[in-house]
Structure formats: C-alpha cells, structure tokens
UniProtKB/Swiss-Prot annotation:
SUPFAM superfamilies found in the cross-reference section: Second domain of Mu2 adaptin subunit (ap50) of ap2 adaptor (SSF49447), SNARE-like (SSF64356)
Organism annotation: Saccharomyces cerevisiae (strain ATCC 204508 / S288c) (Baker's yeast)
Gene3D superfamilies noted in UniProt: 3.30.450.60, Mu homology domain, subdomain B (2.60.40.1170)
Subunit structure: Component of the AP-1R complex composed of at least APM2, APL4 and APS1. Interacts with MIL1. Interacts with APL2.
Name of the coding gene: APM2
Major localization listed first in the record, in broad terms: Golgi
UniProt-recorded name of the protein: Adaptin medium chain homolog APM2
Gene Ontology MF annotations: clathrin adaptor activity
Length: 605
C-alpha cells in the first residue's frame, strides 16, 4: 500500500503531496528520494527502509512511497501502472497534451480530489476518466486569452494542432451535440435518462473559482411513464442546473462487472467512430545500407456515442488469419472479452476434420465488448517488418556535391514512395541537416541562396541549420528528385513522373572579397545598396554562443508524413456490428485508417 504520493517539478521540488498513511515527517522521506535519484535511475528505488516508485512525464515527477513492511502485500508494478494512469487522467481533466508546473499549481484542490477518488488508504480504486468525471465536476482553472472575441486556451490549441483535420471533425461533432442538448433542455425535453425509480444526485458548487464546496443532496422522485413514454412535468430536472446533477447509477458502476460504463446514457444520434492509426518507426544507415529499426506501433482508437448498454462485434483480418505476431504483441482494453477467440481455438481443434465446423468457427472469430462512453483505446499492437519490405517513404539518394571551381555547393536528395497509387500523402516533409556542411565548408550567406522546386517549397532554418522541404501531397509510387539539371536516362527519371528540388549555397571566395575591398578603397562611388536581411550577421549572432560539434541528430534526414486511408501492416476491419437488444436503435459506425511516421523515421547520412 502506498504511504504517500508526491508530484514534483523538474527540480524535484514538491508541488502536491498527499500523506495517505499519516507519516510523521514527509520532508525526510522526500529528502531520501532526492539522495538516491539521478538521471537515468530505474523506476523503482530503495533508500532508508523506503521504496520509491517514480515516473517522469513531461516536466513532472510522479512518486509513490511504500514502506518495506508493506512490500510483501503489494505489487510494485501495480503502483507504477497506477502512476501512468493517473498521469493520463490529469491530461483528460485539463484537456492538454503537456502537463506543466503552473497547471498543477492552479488546480491543487482538483488534483487532491482526484487522488482521493483514485486511491483509498493506499489501495488503488478506479482511474477511469469517464467514471471519475461524473463524480468530480469542477471547472478547470486554465489561462484563457480573448482573441477576436473568442476565448482561447492551451488545451484547445494542443487538441487542434496535434490532430489532423479529420480529428477536428470529431470535436466539432461533440460541440454540435452539446448545443443540441442545450436546446432540448430549454424546450423542456429530457437529455439524459437518470434511472427508473430513484435519483441520487450530488451537486457541485464552484463559485468564482475560489474553492470547491460539495453539497450532497438526495432527492427521491417517482417517474410514472404512460403509454406514450412521456413523463410528468413535476419529474423533470431544473433546466438551468442539469449539468450539476449526476446519474444515481454511477455509484453502483464501480462495483459491477461492467465498471467502465454507467447505465442511463442517452444520445439523440448514436454513432461509433473507430480509427486505426499506425506509426512507422524506421532507422537506416544510408551509407552502409543497414536497417537498424523497422517497426509498426499501431493502436485502434474509438469514440463511442451510443445509448444504453450496446454490445459491439468487430472482426479484424489479423485475427481471422490467426497472425501469430499480432496475437502475441497486442493488448486490448479491459472491456474486450477474448473468451470467444479462445472458444474458437478449441472448436478448431475439435472440428479440424469437419470443413463445415471449421468454416463456422472462422466466421465467428470476432471481438466482442461493451464499450465505455467517450474516447478510449481499444487495442495496441507492435509488429516487426521484414528487412526486405520497402519503407513507406524511401530516401533513394542523398549527395552533397561541392563545386569548388565555381565556389558553389549543391545538396541533392531523392525520395520515393512505396504504397498504392490510389493513395496519397496528406503531409510530407523532409528535413535535411546542414550542420556538417557549414562546418566543413565556408558558406557565404551574404550572397543569395537558390532553391528550385517544381513541387512544394523549401525553407531554410537559420538557427537550427536545416532545410525543410514541404511537399504535402504526393501519390504512391512517384519519385521526387532534387536534381533537375541532371540527365534522365531511365523511366524513373522521366520529368513527367519526377519532381525536383535543388539547393545551392555559395562558398566564400577570398580573392573576390579582397578585390572588392580594394575597389571600394579607390572608388568614389558609394557601395551598392543592399536590401533584405543580412543573413551572415544573423547567423553569427545565433551561433556565437553555440558549440561547434556535430551531434547524432545532425546526421539524420528526417521524413515526416501522413497517409490517410492506408495501413502499413495491412490490418483491416472486416465488419463492425452494434447491437442493443433493449433500445434497438439505428446506429452509425464509422471506420478510418491512417499511417503516420513515428518520431524516429530517419536515415543516417
């Protein structure tokens, strides 16, 4: 059992501390953790009869303290998993991607309330955001700035910038649903079912963000339904404060077998969104031709807006084909029941000689689950690609061509896609490092730098020394070459099927510089007028205080892409069924696919 819980900043200074077991001196316990902690420490440390389970996320440290006498009665990995889930819970509440020190300090009371609900006397209870949000309804204190008569918060920016345009459709859908619910409440209609016989409610009163006053009121109302299904006017909740009341079935949910979904959920339009997102991790030594990493990190993200207690059935081709790598390296949400798959394996062994029985078992191989309300991750998996499998976007050629006689240097890059011609990228950016070029050659930034591209555009980052080639849309099996002046000797180099870009940097000419200086001394004419920014002065100011060594990152050509309607592993959802035997409503399931590059998708040059 956890004795205490800390949230520390990056300097290991306490932001929030919760003394669960009434320890006499928390400061001495924290000082023991500071003594044994260092960069690169394992997640579990021991010092002075104390065990410290710590987790670093963003700019914060989450630390749980356990005494040695309690260690035999608790699983340390369970506490580590709890810290991870608690971090995601804070993200859901604050609606931001990165937790900072200021956000925690501005919401200390809310964080303490969340700790009390998640853990009871050191024992983990529940960390599901959809359940806890119905218990603790507190307005989050986040900074807001008025821009063009509209309020803006950091969470709104992170949610809109991190996702694509398709992800913003979901947020817009939620906003439209909230507006519809508010209109219905104003008209006097019922927005959410609150049980059959009795209603237990908790009213949360938070005035001017000065404190949290929780007033518990218990109201019992009889709901008599007539043949038309309408309720009496006296049974309706007040329209102005419906958001302050919670469903009475929530308290029973956490002790029921289906603890991730409450009863009494109702939506006017029943929809279910399923996204298959695969992140490709690829690292290759371009000079040696050795592939160091070639992995696929996939996840199935769902957004559920269904009424009642629906039962979903999903069939995936990887399960139908009994892919051993997928089955051994995949993890599912707690709502998924894998009993049907295990039963099918037994039926296949029994009916191995019976073709009809084997076909029936194959048709019935599916995932069955009752989804939680809102957004959740249904499945996570990791697959290894074969060495001979071509990457989705391949660096075909990278060459630095110095032309010393002309005092110029050219950088040539070729990339090639390897997916279906019917698909195309919605985003494609190539990051070309220049640190090595600026160290080995003396670049003259006083002269004009030339870029030529018949597709996309090229941006020169002066402070970080790299070129960013923004291509955006590119169809499958189409090659882009950065050397337009080269001779095309094959079909692959046909200018009709190739796009080119060339970056040319001028080299410093000492003889020309001395000659111009002598002419300026003897000439009566003023120096020529120069317009535009002086890049050489800006570069000198930026790089004067920086070290001049080449880091491993400066040798990587990074490729950032996004391919909608495509999966690298070939995973496909065969069908998706929604069944609700009591309500029997019409549902609208949606399935999408997307392949994106991981943070490490690069070539070592």
């Amino acid at each position: 059992m956890s004795s205490s819980l800390f949230i520390l900043d990056e300097n290991l200074e306490p932001l929030v501390s919760k003394n669960i077991r009434a320890l006499p001196n928390l400061s001495s316990v924290l000082s023991s953790f500071k003594q044994c902690y260092h960069d690169g420490s394992p997640p579990i440390l021991s010092q002075n009869d104390w065990f410290f389970i710590h987790l670093k996320r963003d700019f914060l440290h989450f630390v749980s303290v356990i005494h040695t006498t309690d260690k035999p009665n608790i699983d340390l990995m369970t506490i580590l998993a709890f810290l991870e889930q608690f971090y995601h819970l804070l993200q859901k509440y604050f609606e931001i991607e990165v937790l900072t020190k200021n956000v925690i300090l501005d919401n200390i009371l809310l964080v303490l309330e969340l700790i009390d609900e998640c853990i009871d006397f050191g024992i983990v209870q529940v960390t599901d955001p959809s359940i806890i949000k119905d218990y603790i309804r507190v307005k989050v204190n986040v900074p807001r700035v008025t821009v063009d008569n509209e309020e803006w918060s950091p969470g709104e920016e992170s949610s809109s910038s991190s996702g694509s345009d398709s992800d913003s459709e979901y947020s817009n859908t939620n906003k439209r649903k909230d507006k519809k619910k508010k209109r219905k409440k104003k008209k006097g209609t019922k927005g959410k079912s609150v049980g059959k016989s009795k209603l237990k409610s908790i009213m949360v009163n938070n005035k001017e963000n000065r404190g949290i006053n929780v007033v518990e009121t218990v109201k019992e109302t009889l709901r008599n339904k007539n043949d038309t299904g309408k309720e009496a006017a006296n049974d309706e909740l007040p329209n102005d404060g419906n958001d302050l009341y919670i469903n009475g079935d929530i308290a029973k949910t956490i002790i029921m077998p289906i603890s991730w979904r409450t009863k009494g959920i109702h939506y006017a339009k029943n929809e279910f969104f399923l996204d298959v997102i695969e992140r490709v991790q690829y690292l290759m030594d371009f000079e040696k031709g050795v592939i160091r990493k070639n992995l696929i990190h996939g996840e199935i993200v769902c957004r559920c807006y269904l009424s009642g207690m629906p039962k979903l059935k999903i069939s995936i081709n990887k399960i139908l084909n009994r892919d051993p790598q997928f089955m051994s390296n995949s993890s599912f949400h707690q709502c998924v029941s894998l009993d049907s798959i295990n039963t099918i394996e037994k039926d296949e062994e029994k009916n191995s000689d019976d073709d009809a029985g084997l076909q029936a078992a194959t048709d019935a191989r599916e995932i069955e689950f009752i989804p939680p309300d809102g957004e959740f991750v249904l499945c996570q998996y990791e697959l290894k690609r074969h060495v001979k499998d071509a990457p989705m976007v391949r660096l075909k050629d990278f060459e630095i061509k110095p032309k010393l006689k002309k005092f110029k240097i050219q950088i040539v890059t070729k990339i090639q896609t390897n997916f279906k011609p019917t698909n195309s990228t919605s985003k494609l950016n190539v990051r070309i490092p220049l640190t090595k070029v600026f160290q080995e050659y003396k670049i003259d930034l006083s002269k004009q730098i030339r870029f030529k591209a018949n597709i996309g555009k090229v941006v020169f980052n002066l402070s970080d020394d790299f070129l960013l080639w923004e291509i955006q849309t590119m169809k499958g099996h189409r090659e882009h070459s950065t050397n337009k002046s080269s001779q095309y000797n094959s079909d692959e180099d046909d200018p009709n099927t190739c796009a080119s870009m060339v970056a040319e940097f001028p080299l410093f000419n000492q003889e020309e510089y001395d000659r111009l200086q002598e002419e300026m001394k003897t000439s009566m004419n003023p120096p020529p007028l120069r317009t535009g920014p002086r890049l050489e002065e800006l570069y000198r100011q930026v790089h004067d205080q920086q070290t001049s060594h080449v880091t491993p990152r400066d040798k990587l050509v990074n490729i950032d892409f996004e391919i909608p309607y495509c999966t690298c592993s070939g995973l496909k959802v065969e069908y998706l069924k929604v069944e609700e035997p009591q309500l029997q409503y019409q549902s609208f399931p949606w399935v999408r696919y997307k392949t994106v590059s991981d943070e490490e998708y690069a070539y070592i040059v």
